[in-house]
């Protein structure tokens, strides 16, 4: 059984005292050296084992994931196209990325993770691979002191790094502190082996990977090749058409399982959704 499998088993069997959002926020500000991070693993594991609630979530995330929210209905539609594709095999490992910074890919990834975990047959695991500018831990009110960087760089066991988010069936492995060599870690054999194990075990688990934007990090292209599919976030008024086209051409259209149009004016979005019903791609806030 691989390390990822053991980590999931330990995470599922764990129980403990919930960590408050205030203490989590403080721990995220403290920083600290790499060695200090590893020495406090027992404290981090206690945070991960807790049955925390969504009280520590970013307010925008709490509002957008409200089951009665009109925004969340959009993510239900995207969830449906992922779980029940019309003409291609179901993608179980998915990269969420954008072509440029500031397009909202981290926020989209968090919302999609929440939507996927509400399906009765699936669990969702999120990995924050944007080592330069991580966002997922902050959105969920979770410490980012340790994470995937420690697994790749210091051989820390995944069971210490997997965090509960406060929503059943939704877990997160944060990025950890920004490393000096993000590209080398992403492209390492250890990362490739992790993705292989993610793909081969636990068929009820869907994996979402938040990656650096395409125009910022060249390793995003390589990262995409390890995963089943890609969701590309395109922000209204920000994304450049030529960059989007180039990225899609590099990956191949079959690799794209969804396009998320973020930041559309409400009236424009409504008109677009009406026109695109039944089409293979998805369009959201």
Predicted regions and their residues:
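Conserved lysine of the Walker
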Residues: 105
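P-loop/Walker-type NTP enzyme "switch/lid" segment
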Residues: 50-76, 80, 87, 99-102, ...
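C-terminal lobe/tail of nucleotide-utilizing enzymes
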Residues: 2-75, 185, 242-285
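Conserved Switch II/interswitch segment of TRAFAC-class P-loop GTPases
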Residues: 213-216, 227-244
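Hydrophobic positions on the alpha1 helix immediately C-terminal to the Walker A/P-loop
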Residues: 108
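Conserved beta-strand segments of the P-loop GTPase G domain that flank and frequently precede/overlap
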Residues: 95-97, 174-175, 208-210, 232-235, ...
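Active-site signature of alpha/beta-hydrolase-fold catalytic machinery across serine-
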Residues: 111, 115, 138-139
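Pre-Walker A (Motif I) flank of P-loop NTPase domains
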Residues: 90-94
């Amino acid at each position: 059984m691989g390390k990822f499998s053991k980590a999931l088993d330990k995470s599922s069997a764990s129980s403990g005292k919930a960590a408050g959002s205030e203490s989590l926020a403080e721990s995220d500000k403290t920083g600290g050296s790499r060695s200090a991070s590893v020495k406090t693993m027992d404290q981090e594991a206690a945070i991960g084992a807790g049955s925390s609630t969504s009280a520590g979530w970013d307010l925008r995330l709490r509002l957008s994931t409200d089951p009665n929210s009109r925004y969340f209905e959009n993510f239900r539609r995207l969830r449906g196209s992922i779980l029940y594709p019309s003409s291609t095999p179901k993608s179980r490992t998915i990269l969420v990325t954008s072509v440029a910074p500031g397009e909202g890919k981290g926020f989209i990834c968090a919302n999609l993770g929440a939507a996927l975990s509400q399906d009765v047959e699936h669990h969702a695991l999120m990995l924050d691979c944007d080592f330069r500018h991580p966002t997922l831990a902050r959105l969920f009110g979770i410490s980012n002191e340790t994470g995937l960087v420690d697994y790749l760089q210091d051989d820390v066991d995944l069971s210490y790094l997997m965090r509960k988010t406060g929503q059943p069936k939704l877990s997160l492995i944060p990025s950890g502190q920004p490393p000096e060599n993000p590209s080398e870690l992403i492209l390492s054999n250890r990362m490739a082996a992790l993705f292989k194990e993610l793909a081969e075990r636990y068929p009820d688990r869907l994996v979402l990977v938040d990656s650096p934007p395409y125009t910022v990090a060249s390793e995003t292209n390589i990262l995409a090749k390890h995963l089943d599919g890609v969701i590309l976030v395109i922000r209204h008024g920000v994304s450049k058409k030529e960059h989007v086209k180039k990225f899609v051409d590099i990956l191949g259209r079959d690799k794209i399982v969804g396009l998320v149009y973020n930041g559309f004016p409400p009236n424009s979005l409504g008109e677009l959704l009406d026109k695109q019903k039944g089409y293979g791609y998805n369009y959201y806030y």
